[in-house]
């Protein structure tokens, strides 16, 4: 019994009932016979010579009347392990250093919660369904919004660089002529503010959808898209009344000031039979820049 007390953890000892013996396994392959006859507190089976050996994960608490805790040890004293535990492989230890610095994030994303007019939201979904049902079976308002977002980033960059020749097939001719005059009168900082990087577009919304026929019977669909984007162009806040200003800090770098601007692009497509299925931009507006 003294040998078992040294090899087995204390919770494996059980209430003693005379007359039977059972085998208790230690953490090694050595088996010890003890004169114990009891009921397991977990499965309520009688532990006898015919019972299966107690698995290593089975725990039975000792009876309060039979506990023998021995001499008390300090709660924070050094733990002493049995010789059976010495043969077990040591678990890997991961060391930490107070000098290690966490990896710095290179980008900071801004999340803006936008709430559109519920009436307008329902209206645009109804018109989107009509476009799908009567004009284009492959039309999806979600896919169109994603494509419009990419087109906005591309066209706005060309506008800021005054590359109007590359916009001739993307923007309506009468609209492009007006844009040339407006962009030419802008300062360099205002031109830079026209460009919207696709990663700086923080919110996109469907403004309006219209379906109409002209006097020649041609079918047209217009979709107005609204975009909100951040720009780091150096623009005096007085010239952009109503614009929101944000300060963005990336890691340990200096604080960068960005302004939140908005733009509206109206996309148009003719669904007349035999016409090339291309979307063109029929209107471009940049709040406080191109109006």
Swiss-Prot record:
Subcellular location per the Swiss-Prot or TrEMBL entry: Mitochondrion matrix
Source superkingdom: Eukaryota
GO CC annotations on file: mitochondrial inner membrane; mitochondrial matrix
Keywords: Mitochondrion, Transit peptide
Span of the transit peptide along the chain: 1-96
Biological processes annotated in GO: calcium import into the mitochondrion; mitochondrial calcium ion homeostasis; protein insertion into mitochondrial inner membrane from matrix; protein insertion into mitochondrial membrane
Record has Mitochondrion as a keyword: yes
Main location: mitochondrion
Coiled coil (UniProt feature): none
GO MF entries: ribosome binding
Role summary: Promotes sorting of SMDT1/EMRE in mitochondria by ensuring its maturation. Interacts with the transit peptide region of SMDT1/EMRE precursor protein in the mitochondrial matrix, leading to protect it against protein degradation by YME1L1, thereby ensuring SMDT1/EMRE maturation by the mitochondrial processing peptidase (PMPCA and PMPCB).
Subunit structure: Interacts with AFG3L2. Interacts with SPG7. Interacts with SMDT1/EMRE (via the N-terminal transit peptide); interaction is direct and takes place before maturation of SMDT1/EMRE.
Protein name: m-AAA protease-interacting protein 1, mitochondrial
High-level lineage: Eukaryota, Metazoa, Chordata, Craniata, Vertebrata
Protein encoded by which gene: Maip1
């Amino acid at each position: 019994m003294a040998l078992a007390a040294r090899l087995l953890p204390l919770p494996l000892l059980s209430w003693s009932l005379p007359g039977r013996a059972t085998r208790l396994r230690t953490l090694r392959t050595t088996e010890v016979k003890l004169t114990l006859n009891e009921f397991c507190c977990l499965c309520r089976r009688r532990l006898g010579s015919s019972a299966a050996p107690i698995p290593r994960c089975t725990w039975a608490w000792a009876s309060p009347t039979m506990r023998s805790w021995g001499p008390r040890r300090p709660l924070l004293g050094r733990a002493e392990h049995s010789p059976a535990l010495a043969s077990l492989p040591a678990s890997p230890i991961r060391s930490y250093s107070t000098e290690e610095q966490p990896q710095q994030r290179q980008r900071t994303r801004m999340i803006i919660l936008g709430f559109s007019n519920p009436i307008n939201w329902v209206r645009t979904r109804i018109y989107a369904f009509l476009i799908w049902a009567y004009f284009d079976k492959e039309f999806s308002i979600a896919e169109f919004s994603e494509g419009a977002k990419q087109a906005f980033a591309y066209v706005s960059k060309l506008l800021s660089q005054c590359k109007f020749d590359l916009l001739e097939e993307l923007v309506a001719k009468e609209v492009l002529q007006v844009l040339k005059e407006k962009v030419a009168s802008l300062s360099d900082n205002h031109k830079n503010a026209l460009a919207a990087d696709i990663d700086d577009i923080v919110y996109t919304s469907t403004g309006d959808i219209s379906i109409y026929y002209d006097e020649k019977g041609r079918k047209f669909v217009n979709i107005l898209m609204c975009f909100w984007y951040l720009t780091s162009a150096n623009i005096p806040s007085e010239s952009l009344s109503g614009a929101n200003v944000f300060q963005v800090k990336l890691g340990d770098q200096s604080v960068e000031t960005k302004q939140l601007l908005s733009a509206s692009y109206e996309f148009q497509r003719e669904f007349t039979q035999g016409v090339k299925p291309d979307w063109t931009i029929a209107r471009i507006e940049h709040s406080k820049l191109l109006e």
